[in-house]
Amino acid sequence: MHNVTSRWPHQNSIKIEWNLGKRCNHDCSYCPSSIHDSTSPHTNIEILKATVDKLMTLGKPVRLSFTGGEPTVHPKFKELVQYCKHVGISWISVTTNGTLPYEFYASLPVDQYVFSIHLEYDWKRVFNTVESIVDLTKIKVIAQIMAHHDRMDAVLQLRAKCLLAEIPSTVRRIRWTEGDHDLFDDMRYKLNDLEWIKEQDATVQGNCVIDGEQVIHANDVIKLHLNKFKDWSCNAGIESLMINWDGDVHRATCRVGGSLGNIYEGTYVVPSSPVICDRNFCTCAADIPISKHVLSESLSD
């Protein structure tokens, strides 16, 4: 394997992963308190709108992916999304736990929802909402099934429901982020459960191309341990940026290359060249499709 890129012509645009805040109405066992809580203040809507204005000066089409925390708990979230559409953001995705009513999701002018379905909560109600979005709107939907090792019966049920309803889905192994950020703790799974998870190909359209030939979804790249790009040249910062809940900006969700400054404070600098990956594994599906390749000197070794 020598190069990976997006299946779609996104190389001349920029995708922004924007963590709107740490606030979340869930408290999942595998999500550490350092990245979610129920008390952090919401960022002022005028700061958020000013940030959108700054993104629109990047000189290329902007694709926004809102995450959190839980982005929809921000009291001005709908206003923010409407503003993004008004100023010309080209594509908007929202990653959500799906706990709000169908009417809320259907009312937002977004292009895609990624429903992260957590089996520790009322997943059947969330599935019903997802199914309604698919049946009654034209919004693209992806169901991420968070495969908790103690909830495998529910995981199997939910996967079967998604397949039956033809809802695009991925089965995600849990990464217990309080510990090693590179690895998934497969030892928590029973062997037969782990094998089943690894057999579940994403039914979402493949979004990556490997070596110009193999089309594959980013989640499957991670599942098959093809996500080893250390010492590769990566366009993180060219094709992507990540905004943290406090306005700190990085090249991508992996935070390779360190902080670029703070966009809320007007101090960030946009990179003009690729970065050499220094991570053992690329563990976030959002970062996998970013164009990356083996350096020529590595090919000759």
PLM feature spans:
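Flexible mid-to-C-terminal extensions adjoining Fe-S/redox cofactors in radical SAM and related proteins
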Residues: 1-14, 246-301
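Canonical Radical SAM [4Fe-4S] cluster-binding loop centered on the CxxxCxxC motif
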Residues: 7-47
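Disulfide-bonded cysteines in secreted/extracellular proteins and peptides
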Residues: 24, 28-31, 208, 234, ...
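Secreted/processed peptides and extracellular or luminal domains of membrane proteins
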Residues: 30, 34-37, 168, 214, ...
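Glycine-rich short-loop/terminal segments
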Residues: 32, 51, 57-59, 207, ...
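Short catalytic/ligand-binding loop motif for oxyanion handling, primarily in non-cytosolic enzymes
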Residues: 39, 73-75, 102-103, 151-153, ...
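Radical SAM/AdoMet-radical enzyme domain recognition
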Residues: 48-66, 74-161, 168
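A C-terminal junction/extension of Radical SAM enzymes
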Residues: 161-252, 257
